[in-house]
Amino acid sequence: MSTKHHAPTNSTAKDTTSGLFHLNTLPAVQAVAEQLEGTCLSSTWPRLEADRTEQLNSNATLFSGGSAPRDVWAESGLGATIDASVVATGSPLSLIDLCSMTANTILGINDPWVKLKQAAYLLSWRPHYLTARIGCDLYYRVARRILRCFDKFGEPGDFVINLRQCNGSDVVELALHAAWKAAYQYPARRKLAAFRGSYHGENLTANWVSEHQPGRLLAERPDNVVFFPTPLVDAAGELTEDALATLSTLERDGDRYFAAIIEPIQWRNSVHTVPFEFLRRLRDVCTRKSICLIFDEMQNAFGYTGTISFAENCRVCPDITAISKALTSGHGSLAIIVAKKAYREIEGPFGAKSNSGNMLPLVAVDAVLDRLLGMDPEKAKALPAWLPLSLAAELQTGLLTTAYPRAVAMIDEMLAELQRRFPSLIGASKGMGLVRGLVMLGSDGQPSVRLAIAASKVCLIHGVYVRQADTAILIKPCMVLTQAEVDAALIGLSRTFEDVLRIRDEK
């Protein structure tokens, strides 16, 4: 295979209309893929251990509750589209994923650049896995790239990073541990401020500090977690009395708190965005009272609000930022904290999880940063000559400045049209950027959990995937959403809401 490089503008490779394509459509990759055909490594090799009906249906003998296959069987996918079939009928289904496979795949399904970088790494002699006691260049490159995104909130070197966690629950626990460790020498600081409407994960620690709990786990909630009301503004856009009272309480009793943890966008709370003014005032109180401010950014970081971190949106920098999900765009499990140096001390076993030694998620983060922010110009000159011009161009500019505003504009237009078509069913549009919610209204005009659940179930029949988020449906698409996919989603959601209206009227 040729090692010749080029600047994208000089490429003679066949172009595509967007940066999305399946890898096996590239001639340079086809040469390898052809060698796999007819072998057990072929992607078309028979792999079902039973007929499709058995595989599609929930099998209580084979699967535990909560993990059984559901209503749709996926065959392939690209961007926001999953090529699938329906369980009940076996008929083909083109499914538009409006939840980026539940809040992970910011770049959609099968992003070619992330897969190419991972494939290149796998073809190398580099270790695919390293224990926490052994380092490599990849750790340092990814760490420095992420930390540079926080330089605007201080001087280079003001922040540190931990790259050795596997999921959002892990990093919530790690963030709380780092805050607790920093305050340990002050015995009076043992309280944690949390908020109604919050959801921080499913492990024991994250469960304790969440209002939305998946179920009671092993022990009762500790008595040092104080839940304050959901921060809101009134009709005039001013902070409510409850929000102001929260700030006053923390000002008065701040010496008793070691940390405050908050989600900038509470997705389980009907996709509620915390008012920026509240975050600014909370930051001021936490600074004055030496309370560690933690942002749980699982739902918004790495592109969903057009930035790497929410600090860039609200101009409020927390002491610790916890990030997961979109980090790898679904190409592996990884979670991180970025913390001010005062919170760098971490004790074992919190510092590193076993599966965090997998190098492929780190390769994925590096590639996702290429896609979101653009590559270093010198590195971009070394892009392969056979790479389609469209992808090469995107890697020069980054998707945050191009694809993100287009995707938001398309979603804004779609949500407005749905509200116009179904004024008695659809209430407020919540959230921001690509983290959005549509509130479902009952016949009494009040937000309805029942109808939000119904919509999240019915939508699959009509070729759209959304999630229920309390009284709203969560709409959180990938950044590379196309107009054709939005048009198909509008049709599918319109049919969904017509069914939900019938369900509502039947009661």
Locate each region found by the language model.
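Conserved N-terminal phosphate-binding loop of PLP-dependent enzymes in the Aspartate aminotransferase
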Residues: S2-K507
